[in-house]
Amino acid sequence: MNKGYVLALDQGTTSSRAILFNRDGRLVGQVNHEFRQIYPQPGWVEHDPREIWSTQLRAVQDVLARTGVRLSEVAAIGITNQRETTVVWDAETGEPVYNAIVWQCRRTAPICAELAARGWAPRIREKTGLVIDAYFSGTKVKWILDNVPGVREKAEQGRLRFGTIDAWLIWNLTGGRVHATDYSNASRTMLFNIHQLAWDEEILHELGIPASLLPRALPSSHVYGETDPAVLGAAIPIAGVAGDQQAALFGQACFQPGDAKNTYGTGCFMLMNTGDRAVPSESGLLTTIAWGIGDRVEYALEGSIFIGGAAVQWLRDELRFFDRAADSEALALSVPDSGGVYVVPAFVGLGAPYWDMYARGIVVGLTRGTGRAHITRATLESIAYQTRDVLGAMEKDSGIRLNRLKVDGGAVANNFLMQFQSDILGVPVERPKIAETTALGAAYLAGLATGFWRSQAELADKWALDRGFTPALPAEERERLYAGWRRAVERARGWAAE
């Protein structure tokens, strides 16, 4: 039987997806199943791990049924996932001891504050590349051990397992035979030494997490094991695993140091490949593992922007400026410029490179002549300005000058935003033909490990341009506009600190 397909499982924050790619890297079929968001208290976010698994399994079954592709034609499975989200389960029964604590959940902020007060910030940064924050998995695991009755005792007896979502899916797909994660997901736990590629005993001891809970950390392109025929109906190698943003970097063929991509979703995630060098950030970025292939590990710098496309949703849902987010482009283009208006969408504070949780959203530069179109244009421009903030930090930390930016995510369909992004960065912006770069990255990693594709060079050749945008703004105008943005940001900072 000709194995002509790779199956990517893309387990996200709101839905579980299964996507089939053929040997050309073309999307053959996809299925998407949403699941519940659970909010037990303000600032707390959970998912039901059983629901994550059932929706993911159903997506696989449905995409095969819909495309008519048989399991015997699937060469390998790749997994990509929402990062940091934490599951602890019973090793014997496979049952979760508590709901999954989602990356957005802030309940462990007091644990983080205690850790910082004890002087751990420099050590955490040096070992893991991360800042101490409730975003990452480590304090979430500690919370489950400390707050769910009977769990700490079971953990100390070696009867429990922890994993990010990739490890939870691997465990279930293999019928409980494989407990493993990849380097990129491990690097988001705040428990993993990114230089030694090992769980850090000192941090585990400080957080009171028994080592027996932890999955084996393996390269991202690697055969983890085979699916249990009793679960899926056939034994298929699980051969590629990466966190969603790292998978998108790989799917965009950002294989060389200095290659960068920005994903425009609710927020924006920008990653720059730094090669075999884990570049420490002095500018509020995260140092993370991009992927491991064979015995080679590549690193990346990452900047997270909290509010990107969500600012456009705000204009639509709260201010009722338009009915569809896509209408923002025509409205923005109905005026020649923003009329001196700046919008700083710091609705939940500011992420990289500011990390100011007390910043709040502002609109400045209003005059009697300001209309909906000016505010809409300024809101779209704010996404591009925030990206420039992150890029400036990346270039400073890495010493690498960006020569082009690859883009993906929902908002890249907005041609006005993409052109302004190119203008304000002063570099070309490239939008690929295949929008599903995250799933494609997972498929590529799996296909490489099984010989379905021969090399990264072959994958780079498959990358195809949909549309390129080149800077059309004079340099002095670019810098004048950006200086205005920096002034606006200063006025937004620290607003809620009173």
Swiss-Prot record:
Catalytic function, reaction form: glycerol + ATP = sn-glycerol 3-phosphate + ADP + H(+)
Keyword Transmembrane helix: no
EC number of the protein: 2.7.1.30
Pathway it works in: Polyol metabolism; glycerol degradation via glycerol kinase pathway; sn-glycerol 3-phosphate from glycerol: step 1/1
Residues binding glycerol: 83-84, 135, 244-245
A GO molecular-function annotation: glycerol kinase activity
Keywords (A to Z) from UniProt: ATP-binding, Glycerol metabolism, Kinase, Nucleotide-binding, Transferase
GO biological process: glycerol catabolic process; glycerol metabolic process; glycerol-3-phosphate metabolic process
Binding site for ATP: 13-15, 266, 309, 313, 410
Activity regulation, free text: Activated by phosphorylation and inhibited by fructose 1,6-bisphosphate (FBP).
Superkingdom of the organism of origin: Bacteria
Residues the entry annotates as binding ADP: 13, 17, 266, 309, 410, 414
Chain residues that bind sn-glycerol 3-phosphate: 13, 83-84, 135, 244
A single Gene Ontology CC term: cytosol
General function of this protein: Key enzyme in the regulation of glycerol uptake and metabolism. Catalyzes the phosphorylation of glycerol to yield sn-glycerol 3-phosphate.
Subunit structure: Homotetramer and homodimer (in equilibrium).
Family per record: Belongs to the FGGY kinase family.
Protein name listed in UniProt: Glycerol kinase
Natural source organism: Symbiobacterium thermophilum (strain DSM 24528 / JCM 14929 / IAM 14863 / T)
